[in-house]
Amino acid sequence: MSHTIPSASVLPAVARRGFFTAAAAAVAAAKVVAAEDEYGPHAGPVRYPDYRLVELDKRFGKLKLGNTPIQRLYHSPNMLWAEGPAWNGSGRYLVWSDIPNNIQHRWLEEDGHVSVIRNPANNSNGNTFDTHGRQISFEHLTRSVARYEHDGTRTVLADKFNGKSLNAPNDGVVHPVTGDIWFSDPGYGALMDYEGTLADTGSVQPFQKEALYRWEASTGKLFQVADDINKPNGVCFSPDYKKLYAADTGASHYPDAPEEHPRLGHR
C-alpha cells in the first residue's frame, strides 16, 4: 500500500505551518535516534530501557529485561548482507552468512574474535545446528540443504524433490527430538545472480512451486509439507515444538485471517 503526500505548495497556510512544524520535529527526532544508534568509542551513553526493544504482544513484556541493551558484535564496510545467524551453545560461537560475498563468518564469545570460516560458502542463507552440533546450511548456489561434518566435509541432505531441483533453500530448523529438518524454499536465490544464480527457466517459480519441506533424519527422505504459502521464508518452532511458524514475505492475503492482523492466519 502506498500513500501520496501532497507538496507544501498546495496546502493551505495553516496546514503548511503544521506541515513544516511536523517535518522539523521529525528531523530532530531522527537526529536523536541516529545519535543513540551510534556504536564504538565515540557513541553516547546507553539509555534504559533500550527503545529498540519493542514487544508487539504484551505477553512478551515479562521476558524483556529493562537494563538489557542491543549490542553490536561486529561491523565491517565490506560485509554486504548479514543473514542466517545460528548460535552453537556447546562451542559458544555464532555463525552467519554474507550472501553476496559468498562467505560465512564466526564470532567467538570468549574474546569477540571474528573470522571467515567458509569461503566460498555457496551463497548460503540460513544456518542452524543439528542435535550432534553439526552445522546445517541452506544454500542458494547449489540449491541444496547441506550438512558440515565435524571433520569439515560437506554432505548434501536434499537438493531435489520429485526429480526436480529445489529452487534455493532459504531457512530451516532442526527438531530436537526427531532430528528432522524443516525448511523453506521460496526461490529468491534463483531469481538473480546477486544472491545465487539466476535460473534459466524464465519463471518466478524457478524449478518448483514455493514450499515448505521436511527432511526426515531417520530415512533421509524429503517430504513437502505445504505449497500454499506465497513466499515461505523464515521458520521457527513453538516453544513445545508442536507447531511450525513460517513467515510469508510474498504479497499475499488470507481470507480467514483475523481482522486485527490481516496478514496473519492459521496455517
Give the predicted meaning of each segment.
Residues 37-68:
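Blade/loop signatures of beta-propeller domains
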Residues 12-18, 26-38:
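N-terminal twin-arginine translocation
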Residues 1-14, 22-25:
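N-terminal secretory signal peptides
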Residues 63-75, 113-120, 151-163, 211-231:
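Blade-edge beta-strand/turn elements of extracellular beta-propeller
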Residues 51-55, 69-99:
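Beta-strand-rich domains and repeat architectures in extracellular enzymes and scaffolds
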Residues 76-92, 120-139, 144, 162-181, ...:
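Beta-rich, blade/repeat-based domains predominating
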Residues 184-206, 249-264:
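Short, conserved, GDST-rich strand-edge loop motifs in beta-rich repeat architectures
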Residues 143-201:
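Asp-box/WD-like beta-propeller blade repeats and closely related beta-sheet repeat scaffolds
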